[in-house]
Amino acid sequence: GKTINKSRHAYALGQLVLWSPIDDLIDTKASILQSRDFRFIAMANPKIAPYGEATRQTLTSMNLWKALEEKLIRGENIAQTFQFVNSGNAKLGFISFSQIVNSNYEVNGSYWKVPKSLYEPIEQQVVLLNESFLAEDFLSYLLSEESQKIISRFGYDIPL
């Protein structure tokens, strides 16, 4: 292969949330999903976006995929999905927790952190493509305790 042997590592795990800019719309059980009291719900495209696939898995685990299918609007990625909700085109949507805690502006509203048991881990991975002291140093830093604390502060879980 074209990668350095044993250099592939998961350094962060994405966390899926259901978010709305409307205060108190989403409760701790995401009851709104069962009530279906919304016109549209945004998600990333599950065919090309890991968070979209995690959303599909979540709704399937909750036996809601078929029931909500006609209300789903799909963004190409979670950035576009966030914009659908933030602009009001959808009342709520599934995004990355990091988009709420790491925003260039204050993000208001309500959210439900999706239990990890409802979707496969969303691994953020790194791999070295060639021998380079700088790349190896960066990889060491990325996997260091110092870096992991920063990554965690920005809304990601740390793999064991």
What is the predicted function of each stretch?
Residues G1, S7-L160:
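Exported/periplasmic ABC-transporter solute-binding proteins
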